[in-house]
Every structure is written in structure tokens, then in C-alpha cells.
Curated annotation (Swiss-Prot):
Family: Belongs to the RecR family.
Coiled-coil region list: none
Gene symbol of the encoding locus: recR
GO biological process, one term: DNA recombination
PROSITE patterns: RECR, TOPRIM
Protein name, UniProt field: Recombination protein RecR
Record's keyword terms, sorted: DNA damage, DNA recombination, DNA repair, Metal-binding, Zinc, Zinc-finger
Naturally occurring in which organism (per UniProt): Lactiplantibacillus plantarum (strain ATCC BAA-793 / NCIMB 8826 / WCFS1)
Functional note: May play a role in DNA repair. It seems to be involved in an RecBC-independent recombinational process of DNA repair. It may act with RecF and RecO.
InterPro entries: DNA_Rcmb_RecR, Rcmb_RecR, Rcmb_RecR_Znf, TOPRIM_dom, TOPRIM_RecR
Keyword Zinc-finger: yes
A Pfam family that the UniProt record links to this protein: RecR_HhH
Length: 199
């Protein structure tokens, strides 16, 4: 049976989200149709507002309403360390542990030759520019995920940053290989920051 066009379009829209396959998209589409009209309107407004009002910080690449973001503007934070993460959601995970009080830099991805992602496709050039322009930064903590791509990205950044005389460390791997920072519990992240290793 073929679905009416509005349902088919809704299913297709949900399938564009990462990790959402056909069955889940269909379930979400029918759930959306069954929702109260006001809730659907509010949901749609939230999507539009998020896309319209949020952008990336011109300094660190984090998601923000203001530019620069609240973290970059906060002079009480440790200005000598920059923690490099893959995605903005990793900043949120690190902030939850309340252990790290430095600055961040969001790469928006990792090096992945298989996926055709090279250094020019992620936020590395702006990190290097930031380090050149800010002599207060003494340490770069690399917090990419413990995946082959995350490790390759960490090594690449380390090779670029070390010649500038900036200390480069890597989060300790209380994080298991293949795990994502956003899914780690607070104690694991705390231990990973505490036990970071020099590269």
C-alpha cells in the first residue's frame, strides 16, 4: 500500500535524520499525525526557530545564539587551555561534568578519507589561526572520539600544533575504543579529563 503524499513526504523528511531508518521514520510520521494540533505547531515552530536563530560561534565553532558564544565571552574561564571536540554536542557533555573550565574548539567532524573528509572539510584551519593569534593558549586537549577517525584526527592536529611549542594532550581513555563522548557518563568524562596524556 502506498501512503498518501503528505505522509510519504513526512517519512522522507524523518529519514534524513541520522540513525533514522524507514520503520522509525514511519512510526514518527504516524505519531506526528496523531499529535494534538497545537503540539505539532509548536514542534514546527521550534524546528524553524532553531534553524533561524542558532549559528556557529566565529571563534570556537560551538552552537550559539550570540556571537561570540557565552563560553568564549566568559573571561573567568581558563584562557590557557582549548579542548578540541568533534561536535557541539560534545561541548554540552563536557560542560555537564563541571570539571573543565577552559575554552573549546569544535571541529564539526573528523578526518575520514573513506567518506571523502579531509582537513579542509573540518574546522582545523580556524583552530590553527586561533592558536597563532592567541599567545595565552598554552595547552590543546584533544577530545576526539576513540574511533579510528578520531585517533587519526588527533594525531593530525598534534603534528600541526606541537611545532608551535604548545602542549598537546589527549583525554585519557576511560572512554572505551569506539565510544562517543556525548554518551559517556559524567564520572568517565571526569576521569578522562583528569588523566589526560601528553601526545
Amino acid at each position: 500500500m502506498q501512503y498518501p503524499e503528505p505522509i510519504a513526504k513526512l517519512i522522507d523528511s524523518y529519514m534524513k535524520l541520522p540513525g533514522i531508518g524507514g520503520k522509525t521514520a514511519t512510526r514518527l510520521a504516524f505519531y506526528t499525525i496523531d499529535m494534538n494540533g497545537d503540539d505539532v505547531t509548536e514542534f514546527a515552530k521550534s524546528l524553524i526557530a532553531a534553524k533561524r536563530d542558532l549559528h556557529f560561534c566565529s571563534i570556537c565553532g560551538n552552537i550559539t545564539e550570540d556571537d561570540p558564544c557565552v563560553i568564549c565571552k566568559d573571561k573567568s574561564r581558563d584562557q590557557s587551555t582549548v579542548l578540541v571536540v568533534e561536535e557541539a554536542k560534545d561541548v554540552m557533555a563536557m560542560e555537564k561534568i563541571k570539571e573543565y573550565n577552559g575554552l573549546y574548539h569544535v571541529l564539526h567532524g573528523v578526518l575520514s578519507p573513506i567518506d571523502g573528509k579531509g582537513p579542509e572539510d573540518i574546522n582545523i584551519a580556524s583552530l590553527l589561526k586561533r592558536l597563532q593569534q592567541n599567545e595565552a593558549i598554552k595547552e590543546v586537549i584533544i577530545a576526539t572520539n576513540a574511533t579510528p577517525e578520531g585517533e587519526a584526527t588527533a594525531m593530525y592536529i598534534s603534528r600541526l600544533v606541537k611545532p608551535a611549542g604548545i602542549k598537546v594532550t589527549r583525554l585519557a581513555h576511560g572512554l572505551s575504543v569506539g565510544s562517543d563522548i556525548q554518551y559517556a557518563d559524567e564520572m568517565t568524562l571526569f576521569k578522562a579529563v583528569e588523566g589526560r596524556q601528553e601526545m
